[in-house]
């Protein structure tokens, strides 16, 4: 597929939503598709500060996407050491601008990639007492840009409980309960969200067992038993309850 075809396809997907904004950010799209991430980000940042464009969601999203792409490339590591963190930060800012999710669904592939990166980063930190603060920031950001993702809420609650923030953990579990109810059939969740949910259910069960509340561990584990029982780590947890 040629670059021109890719640009046309992406522009078509977003065309209905773009009509609602004063500015059509074809300049950002072209730079992004051409992999000129630094230039694209710098230009998007000017839009986020301009009086006529600072309320538009898309420039904030482009800043996030460019940071994400730069976080994967060694040539940007020295100048942008916090690119992965900034990708999450700007994704949150984008979502605050796009409260009605006018553009959100056009970027499902990006959300899956960002979720995967964030979840792996957060889980790598969650078992290290020195990493809890960063893990908390990561999962908090995930719930900020994608509050419909139930596993992110449960992971955030787990980190908060581990950090002796019981009240905050309880609030996050309330948000998890709402998100899981709204999700409906969890087998239809995107793969990245299913994986995070499975891992969160296992960790939450382990946490409750350590507290001596095996009944609560089993009650929440039941959420995933019809979907995850074929996976050894989940089955091992279930059999231990």
Question: Where do the model's predicted regions map?
Answer:
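Start-of-domain marker
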Residues: 21-85
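Bacterial Sec-dependent N-terminal signal peptides
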Residues: 1-29
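Amphipathic alpha-helical repeat scaffolds of TPR domains
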Residues: 22-26, 55-73, 99-127, 150-158, ...
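Canonical positions in the second alpha-helix
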Residues: 47, 94, 142, 176-179, ...
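Short coil turns that delineate tetratricopeptide repeat
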Residues: 52-54, 99, 146-148, 181, ...
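Short coil/turn connectors between adjacent alpha-helices in alpha-solenoid helical repeat scaffolds
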Residues: 28-32, 70-87, 118-133, 161-172, ...
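Terminal, low-structured helical/coil segments at or just beyond the last alpha-helical repeat
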Residues: 192-196, 200-241
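Surface-exposed, polar helix/loop patches in the mature regions of secreted/periplasmic/lumenal proteins
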Residues: 81-143
């Amino acid at each position: 597929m040629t670059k021109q075809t890719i640009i046309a396809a992406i522009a078509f997907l977003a065309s209905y939503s773009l009509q609602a904004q004063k500015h059509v950010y074809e300049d950002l799209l072209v730079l992004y598709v051409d992999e000129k991430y630094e230039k694209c980000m710098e230009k998007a940042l000017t839009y986020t500060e301009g009086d006529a464009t600072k309320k538009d969601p898309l420039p904030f999203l482009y800043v996030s996407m460019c940071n994400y792409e730069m976080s994967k490339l060694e040539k940007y590591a020295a100048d942008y050491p916090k690119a992965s963190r900034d990708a999450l930060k700007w994704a949150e800012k984008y979502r605050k601008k796009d409260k009605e999710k006018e553009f959100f669904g056009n970027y499902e592939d990006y959300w899956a990639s960002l979720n995967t990166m964030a979840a792996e980063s957060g889980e790598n930190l969650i078992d290290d007492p020195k990493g809890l603060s960063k893990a908390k920031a990561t999962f908090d950001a995930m719930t900020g840009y994608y509050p419909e993702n139930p596993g992110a809420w449960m992971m955030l609650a787990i980190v908060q409980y581990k950090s002796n923030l019981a009240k905050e953990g309880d609030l996050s579990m309330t948000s998890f309960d709402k998100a899981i109810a709204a999700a409906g059939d969890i087998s239809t969740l995107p793969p990245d969200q299913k994986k995070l949910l499975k891992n969160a259910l296992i960790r939450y069960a382990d946490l409750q067992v350590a507290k001596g509340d095996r009944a609560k561990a089993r009650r929440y584990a039941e959420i995933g038993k019809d979907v995850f029982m074929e996976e050894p780590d989940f089955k091992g947890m279930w059999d231990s309850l």
